[in-house]
Design a protein with these regions (language model features):
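Extracytoplasmic thiol/disulfide redox context detector
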Residues: 3-82, 157, 161-162, 195-202
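Aromatic side chains
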Residues: 29-30, 45-48, 93, 110, ...
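Generic detector of short, locally flexible boundary/turn motifs and exposed helical patches
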Residues: 37-43, 58-60, 92-93, 132-138, ...
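Solvent-exposed, acidic/flexible segments
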Residues: 39, 49-56, 82-89, 98-102, ...
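C-terminal cap of thioredoxin/glutaredoxin-like
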Residues: 47, 132-202
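Sec/Tat-exported extracytoplasmic proteins
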Residues: 49, 64-67, 96-100, 109, ...
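Extracytoplasmic/secreted envelope proteins and their assembly/folding machinery
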Residues: 57-64, 86-93, 106, 123, ...
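Structural microenvironment flanking redox-active thiols in thiol-disulfide oxidoreductases
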Residues: 67-98, 103, 107, 111-131
């Protein structure tokens, strides 16, 4: 955990590279599957209960700004943190995504858990957080158990399992390359690594 904290601080305070880095398999990335996705994509695995995911938010925001136009950015919430509320907040993310209010809701949930230290204890608490973010509670009610949201949650679990995700935050590029952040020294180096993996053909 201490290593991850040092890494995150380094990524945030060192925005520019002095030289173009050389990225190597099993040092900067791992191959987790043998085939690429049909179209270029970056998938972030995260949990609202993960403090490092919260600290990673500005880094991911900068990454999204710099991704090529043809690259799809996806977020996959995992259910293995947060005990019984883990799956509930995984479903909450799906609701926010379906209602196209994720950018409003995610900061509110992260703040409640990571800054205020007062995580939601029930679906009613989650609903209240949506309302705090400006979402009509009735819209939440109509979506939370919908077929669409249930299907999204099932896909999140399939992604987590098929890519063998055991820790967050994790970033997978083109469904094949798992980013290793241990040796990354800045946000720009992290983004350069992601772009490098997007271009890999082997």
């Amino acid at each position: 955990m201490k290593k991850m904290f040092v890494l995150l601080v380094g990524l945030l305070i060192a925005p520019f590279l002095q030289a173009a880095p050389e990225f190597k398999e099993n040092v900067n990335y791992e191959i987790i599957r043998q085939t690429n996705t049909p179209k270029p994509e970056v998938m972030e695995f995260f949990s609202y209960y993960c403090p490092h995911c919260y600290q990673f938010e500005p880094i991911m925001a900068e990454l999204k700004k710099q991704l090529p136009a043809d690259v799809t950015f996806k977020r996959t919430p995992v259910a293995f943190l947060g005990k019984e509320m883990g799956p509930e907040l995984q479903r909450a993310y799906a609701v926010a995504d379906l209602l196209k209010v994720e950018e409003k809701v995610t900061p509110v949930i992260f703040k409640r858990i990571q800054t205020e230290g007062n995580p939601p204890q029930s679906r009613a608490d989650v609903r209240a957080l949506f309302e705090q973010a400006g979402v009509d509670g009735k819209d939440f009610d109509g979506a939370v158990d919908s077929f669409a949201v249930t299907g999204m949650v099932a896909q999140y679990d399939r992604n987590t399992g098929s890519m063998n995700i055991r820790a967050v935050p994790s970033t997978v590029v083109n469904g094949k390359y798992l980013v290793k952040t241990e040796g990354i020294k800045s946000t720009e180096e992290y983004i350069a690594l992601v772009k490098f993996l997007l271009q890999k053909k082997d």
